[in-house]
Amino acid sequence: MGVRKDLKRAKRRTDLASRTRVEVVRDEDGVVREARTPALAPRPTTGSTADLPFTNAAEAPEAVVLRRRHDNGTWQPVTAAAFAREVTAVAKGLIAAGLEPGGRVAVMSRTRYEWTVLDFAIWAAGGQTVPIYATSSAEQVEWIVRDSDARFVVTETAENAATVTTGTARHERQPRIWQLDEAAMSDLTILGGHLPDEEVTKRRAALTPGTTATICYTSGTTGKPKGCVLTHANLHAEAANTVELLHPIFKEVTRQVASTLLFLPLAHILGRTLQIACLMARIEIGHCPSIKPDELRPALKEFRPTFLVGVPYLFEKIHDTGRATAEKIGRGASFDRADRIGVRFGEAYLNKFLETGKGPSPALYAAWALYDLLVYRRVRKELGGRMRYAISGGSPLDRNLNLFFYAAGIIVYEGYGLTETSAAATIVPPLRPRPGTVGVPVPGTAVRIAADGEVLIKGGVVFGAYWNNPAATDAVLQDEWFATGDLGALDEDGYLTITGRKKDILVTSGGKNVSPAVLEDRLRSRPPIGQCVVVGDNRPFVAALITLDPESVAHWLTVRKLPADTPLSEVVRDPRMRADVQKAVDYANEAVSRAESVRAFTLVEGEFTEDNGLLTPSLKVKRHAVTAAYAEEIEALYGG
């Protein structure tokens, strides 16, 4: 497989191994309490991320840095020179519209090419970008626009524009609104057509690394979103160090033109820093407006990326779809064997690569080769056929699922971070993968475990303040250490494992502390589970609310030759479905003690979605909203 050849070539390069040197600090008992990785990219003393398009245009004007999709499914290449010209034209339009240095422009759109142009144009004009999720309500928009004092808003659709208009109707000064679907980019280009390019050059020259680049509002599960202030230095620390660490694997060693399809919402900081890193490395970027697998899969087959950055949900759906397809053609048992073989093969090969054990036996190699023909190559085909690498973040990825993808020729590196850390604070180093962990500190970053188990982060990626909220800032920043609210542990080599959220820890009536995330992550990795919430605080045992994945339900009905329109109310009561869900529960319980295991569950009708207020835009469950919405079902679990 190409990916394993890549790793062998990379391993022979001694300069790459030195890039992942991790220093650890132990407490008096010998337990690792802190890990830090030296920076690979120097901190900038001048300039800003606004300079990137222009640096690329000067150094490699004909290099293809983006591809823009047309309605017929073709992808038009965009050169560095062309991208810089478009950024300049839109920046001049914003200046002509009245954007002052330090002024804020909100962008409310799904992920599309124009979003990237706007981000760099706002910076080039000396402004600050305020991203808004395209699914935000009028109330959320009202708060973000008012709190940030954004004078301009660029929306994608008429519906988005109407939401902004409604949300800001009572503002003393309504923002000026443009709409991408109604030629916003052309309008801005025409508006600034009379200005000389030098005006943009002058605005860019006034920016420094410490200038605010963006105010990102957290999609918190409770309370009003907080505006996280990130500077150009923050974004540079994240992108430049990540490129230095991963660039040799993603571009140089693979010996193929590197490209990625960006589908994460650009209102999320991970997507934003990804596009900066790609422009730094001149990796081709494409855009897809949806994270939904059914809409994403066709784009993957068209664009054929060499790597992706996604969330566990995507990898779970790809795996589950493969299994459902296999069952439809009578090869469900074969897929299950491929699953088991994949885990064993991935484990054995990694042991050999890391020199911690023997590699796959001849028999295991032969079994892998068979299932590569039957199963694994189909997985690669689903992802476009060229993909070798992926980065997963947002929540833990099931270890066995990670090993399955490894057997399929795709290495998934996990990372961990928050908006406040400019995206990734840790990542699994390419030459020292360790499935089941979220890696070591990103170069230039330190991770510390507090006495109560909370993960603390320090370094160039850490934000400086919440906008207009010094009390909230003081609550999480102490001596430049950011208190994440997550619980975790460092191993002997400085690899971090996240064990849950500090505020989500359940304490049963028997006094047992339970981290619901461990159970929930494993549950979600198994069909037919859609979403779930583990409960049990002040209760005699742990239980779970579980939704069914619609695709899994449709497949389940087909396999059992039941009517496709069978009501969900009947499906959730079917003993056969409950037996299948119990298998997923048993798998989740393998990771915990008996006292922490799920003893009972209820299958609820419907789904947890953004629309019903039970998911955030980044697909995280709003735990308190779910428990409130299903209070009766929870009481019934405990005999109430």
Residue spans for each PLM region:
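Structural core segment of the AMP-binding/adenylate-forming
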Residues: G2-R19, A96-A97, A124-L191, D580
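ANL superfamily adenylate-forming
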Residues: K8, H70-N72, E159-P209, G322-Y376
